[in-house]
Amino acid sequence: MDTFPSIFPPGGDSRLNPEPEFQSMLIDERVRCEHHKHNYQALKIEHKRLQEEYVKSQNELKRVLNEKQTNQEKFQLLLEELRGELVEKVKDMEAMKLQILTPQKLELVKAQLQQELEAPMRERFRTLDEEVERYRAEYNKLRYEHTFLKSEFEHQKEELTRISEEEKMKYKSEVARLEKDKEELHNQLLSVDPTRDSKRVEQLVREKTHLLQKLKSLEAEVAELRAEKENSGAQVENVQRIQVRQLAEMQATLRSLEAEKQSAKLQAERLEKELQSSNEQNTCLISKLHKADREISTLTSQVKELKHANKLEITDVKLEAARAKSELERERNKIQSELDGLQSDNEILKSTVEHHKVLLVEKDRELIRKVQAAKEEGYQKLVVLQDEKLELENRLSDLEKMKVEHDVWRQSEKDQCEEKLRASQAAEEAARRELQSIRLKLQQQIVNTEKAEKEKLENSELKQQISHLQIQVTSLTQSENDLLNSNQMLKDMVERLKQECRHLRSQAEKVQLEVEKTLEEKQIQWLEEKHKLHERITDREEKYNQAKEKLQRAATAQKKRKSLHENKLKRLQEKVEVLEAKKEELETENQVLNRQNVPFEEYTRLQKRLKDIQRRHNEFRSLILVPNMPPAASVNPANFQSSAIVPGVELSFPPHLQEEQHQRELSLLRKRLEELETTQRKQLEELGSPGE
């Protein structure tokens, strides 16, 4: 801005001359400003790019550090896993020790064997007792049902007898009353004049209707008695069915008892086989015990040899461990001094880093003034960062190599630990190999710690491994002591087992003798039960055959009686229908005669005709009521034809004769009913005796 006064002229005449110069200067300034602006923007973009690269490099450094930490954590996890595997294998050893037989375990095995042998026998006896109780309950139930049915049958029988007696008394009283009425009517007929016959006939017709109603009521009673008879027959059939069902149930129970007897025989045979197999198993176990005694003796001799060899090897290992310990202490001191130097270098590097940070801040301030210098310095820094990146990559590759070597070392250590657990004889040689491998690995780690930044943790791991090895050495000594104690315990156990085997042999012999005795007793009991069952079966079969024969006889007799009664009832029904037809004809003729006046001569002639008809009718009735007469002579159509010759005159006979005939028919019917009742009672008694 100081150049402007020198440009403008002092005079006023020269105003037009400086304007183009001023414009050219403005244009130049504008061009410079634009150039500076472009440069500033380019420098700004470059500065952003450099900052981004710086952030990326820091992120990569953090990532590398995180990966290193993760690798260290993985190594620690591997160590913990190996320790856990060692603990598990120690537990497995203890479990194997616990699996050795002890006297308590032997007692438990004995108790289990005894329970397994006694449980099925007890279960079988319990089931047999339950079955006996069940059969007993069924027998009591059947007996109770039989008594109940018998009592019901007797009660029904008594009711039938009572009802029949009441009916008899009623019929007898009615018969006596009817006979008295008949005598009175007969006397009245003899005393009455013939002129008053018409009125008397009307009265007799009324009485006849009344008697017909009584006859219908008596027929209804006869039908009721027939229905009662059918009911009694149905009850008898029900009783027969019940008896047949009970017999079938008894046969089923007998079959089930035979099946149970066979199953008991099979079970006895199976128990004998089990006893034989148990004896064979006892012999096998005794032979196995002898073999175990021999193996234990060989193992004791081997253990003694191993003890002697272990003592010699332990002394060698102790000497080598002392030497290795002194060497490790020397190496530890060297590593400690190197670590101190590395820590001092690390502090110097930290201070340089802080100084660089300060310089970076100052350079950021000077970037506005010195863009070109900043650009060059930026390029130099990029080169330095790339070099550092290459160094970091080299370190990462070295760390990966160390990781691979460490993994190999871990795998070898794991294999060595497994070999230690599997074979106690090679434990000392594995320890020597581990010490040599540890020395080599320590040397490799010392060489690698010159290139790494954080090797202090690895040294601590090495210290832990050394302490772990010392612990392993102490554990080996303890395991030797445990082996000595276990060998002594095994010897004691062998002696105890021998004594227990002898005791078990004696107990097994006693148990075998007891089982044989019990089997003999049970066989005797089973034979007695079998004999008793055979006797019961024979008795039941005899009773069943007798009852069956009685039932067959009763059934045949009942069928015959039933057929005879059915035939007789059919005949009686036919005759009753004929008589009803005759009665209807007589009623019609009687009505006709009532309308007409009959002279005395015709009356006498009709009386004679009536006597002839009564005689024929009595003959016909005797044929109907007497069952021994042939059915061919029961009906004479000529008589009916002759009776029908005089339709208007011959039915004017006196009514008292009709009443007498009716009374006779009723008396004959009562007799037949009484005979039927007696036959039914006899049949019921015959059916009741086989049921009892």
Curated annotation (Swiss-Prot):
Q: Where on the chain is Phosphoserine found, per UniProt?
A: 689
Q: Give its localization.
A: Cytoplasm, Cytoskeleton, Microtubule organizing center, Centrosome, Centriole
Per UniProt, which keywords does this protein have? Cilium biogenesis/degradation, Coiled coil, Cytoplasm, Cytoskeleton, Phosphoprotein
- Gene Ontology CC: one annotated term: ciliary transition fiber
Could you tell me which cysteines form disulfide bridges? none
Q: Kindly indicate whether the keyword Coiled coil belongs to this entry.
A: yes
Cite a single GO BP annotation: establishment of centrosome localization
Subunit (UniProt): Interacts with CEP164 and IFT20.
Describe the family membership recorded for this protein in Swiss-Prot or TrEMBL: Belongs to the CEP83 family.
Function, please?
Component of the distal appendage region of the centriole involved in the initiation of primary cilium assembly. May collaborate with IFT20 in the trafficking of ciliary membrane proteins from the Golgi complex to the cilium during the initiation of primary cilium assembly.
Name assigned to this protein: Centrosomal protein of 83 kDa
